[in-house]
Every structure is written in structure tokens, then in C-alpha cells.
Swiss-Prot record:
Its EC number is 2.4.1.-. This is GPI mannosyltransferase 2. It is an enzyme of class 2 (transferase). GO terms for biological process: GPI anchor biosynthetic process. It comes from Gibberella zeae (strain ATCC MYA-4620 / CBS 123657 / FGSC 9075 / NRRL 31084 / PH-1). Mannosyltransferase involved in glycosylphosphatidylinositol-anchor biosynthesis. Transfers the second mannose to the glycosylphosphatidylinositol during GPI precursor assembly. It is found in: Endoplasmic reticulum membrane.
Amino acid sequence: MNLLDYKSRPILSLTSIFAAWKSFLLAIALGASIGPDYDTSTSLFFAIVHGASSPRSLATRLTRWDALYFMHDAVKGKVYEQEWAFGIGMPAAVRSICGLLNLQRWEALVAIAISHVSHLVAVLALYQLTIVLCNDRKLAYLASVVHVLSPAGLFISAPYAESPFACMSFVGNLLYAISLKSSPDSLKRNLAVVGAGLSYGISCTLRSNGLFGGVLFAVETVKCLLALRNGFSISKILRLVAPLIGGILVAVGFVAPQVLAWMRYCNGNEEQRAWCGHRIPSIYTFVQAEYWDVGFLKYWTPNQIPLFLLAAPMLTILLKSGTETMREPSRGLGAVAMGTNEESRLLVRTLAAIQTLLAVLAITNYHVQIISRLSSGYPVWYWWVASCLMDKQRQSLGYGVIVFITMYAAIQGGLFASFLPPA
């Protein structure tokens, strides 16, 4: 039996490639245990939280950088103000599973398991999303393989929110694409749109950039409102309800953590923090600026030039694939211009615009080096690379991207497991 036969056994083939690549990355992480850590934060954290009962080597090697915040939240809840920079979704999931199965002291390994399972689900969701949009099995397979080999590397194996975020985003995209294949007035379409909103809402609890998913529902709402200019009908009004509910669910996913923080810090008789008096009292934007110095052009300093250079290849891929696909969707999905409806092309263009916006914000506002892991949750560049691999004129470009992302992921894996930058 050929495990790599994408035509007859695509799911088995993708799962086999996924298992092989993850085994390779985990071997790198375990191999890094030979040398001493650059930073002792992990060992100190586990000593404080778990005492003499130290976790296994794999857990310590993957609990690096921001994973410490996620794991502290999973074990102790949000104790310090700066912890609100990180989503509540991943720690809540770990805490719930550990409580349900009585797996206290196993939080890190449970989080690692969640990351792996959600990454695999994301791979399969991307495959099915591509099939729904253009029915090209080879393109779907290649795009999913590129997602397996994501430059995010060990970040999507570690106790981070990147894998669950990609999972919920791709599931949301898939449900939205399924809705476009149904009759405009059908219950199936409306339920799929609401389900997509719920998925994106959950993604907002994992990473704040899940809010970009709301653009899909805003576009659909505008379309429905414009349709009302030609006359009112019950079906047109009902058609408007689903994207409105979907958009509200996305907003709730983003706002809910802010409300919880406001109730904790701003709703008592104690001295309130400065952000409580802001016009929009968001703890997230406050702690990002206060503790991580995130803001417009704040990262544009001479000492950050190496990080901009490090991020340049991935930014170039995101911008090039995004802008090309916005102009002509077939540059990303070869068959999307032929045999698919205008709604599907609009969806692809919207996803390309969201990806382009992410890249621009990474340049102007974010810590630019995180783009390699943020990119893992956006499908357009995977389609674009896959289409390059299938196009003889652009095939060398596609192979070049594959070589780059695999080398980047492998090297970054060794650095990550040793607690070395960049993060």
C-alpha cells in the first residue's frame, strides 16, 4: 500500500507526512536537550508550579518563550496583568481537559497534544476547503502538505495557540465555503454561516487576529443590504440574519476576554488601572503597548533590522501571494476562475485581502519576527505555493519556497528548544 498516494488515499497520505514531519521536529527538540538551556525560565517555572515532580524532557523542551504564559494561565489562571496579552482559549481548554481527566501536573503534555491534534485537523480542513472551492485534488493535497511544513515549526507543536487558531480559522473558512454551495435561502446555508462565525469567534479567544475573520461576514452583510435596494422580501431579510449572527459571534469571541478583565480590574472600589478610563477600555491593547511596546512603527529601530531581514522572506511570500490572488484568484487557486461561482471568487479575494492586511500590520505594528508563525493560520499563500508547484513557469519558485520553509522550520526548531531567539 502506497502511503503517499494522494489520488486514492489523500487523508492517509497527509496523515503519514504529518506524522513523519512532526517526528523529525520532535527529534530536533529532544536532541537539543543534550546541551544546557540558554535561559532557565522553564526549569524555574516547573520547579515553582510542580515542585520536585519535574515534567518529562519533551514538555520542558517545548515550553519556551510565550508558552510559559499559556501554561501559567492553565495552572494558576491569569495572575498578572501582562498575561492578558495572551488569549484565554488555549489555557481554558488545557485546564478543562486536565480537570475532566484528572491530569493535574500533565498540563504541558496535554497542551502539546492539543497543538498536534489541532494542527492535523487544520491540515485536513484545508484539504477539504480547497476541494470545496475548486475541486482540484492535487492542488488541495499540495497546499495541505505546505501547511504541514509550515515555517512556524515547533511553535505549532508547542503549548502555543497557533495550531488551535489555524484549526478554527480553517474550519470557519470551510463552513463558509460550504454555505456558498447551498441555495441562498436554504437552512443549510444559514447554519453553515453561523457555524463559521462560531469557529471564528473561538479563534478570537486564541489569537486576537481572529477578529479579521469578521471581514467575511461584513462583506456578506453589505451584499445582503445592497440586495434590499431592489425590493424587500422575507427571504432577503432572513438571508441577512445569518451573517449578522456570524459577525456578532466573532465580536463576542474578541470582546469576552476584555469584559472579563474589565470586571476584574475596573469594577471595584480599589484603585483602577489607567486603561479602565480609556474610551474603549481594552486590556489587550494596553498590555501590548505597556509591556511589549507594540504600536505603530515602534519596532522600527536600528537594533531590530536583523529581525526585519529574518521576516522578509515570509513577508514577501504573504504580500506577493495576497496581492496576486486579490487581482486574479486563479493565481492562488488555479481552477477558481473556471467552474466556480462569483461568490467563491469573492471569498478567495477576501481571504487574500485579510492575509495582505496581516503582513502590512506585521511590518508597521507587530514584533515582525512573529510573522512566520502568524502565517500558519492563513490559507491563501498555501494555495499560491501549491499552484506554483503545478505551473511549469513558476515551479522553480515553488520549490524554492518549500526549501526555505523546511530549512527555516528545522533551524528554528533547534533554536526554540534551546530557548534561543528569535521568538
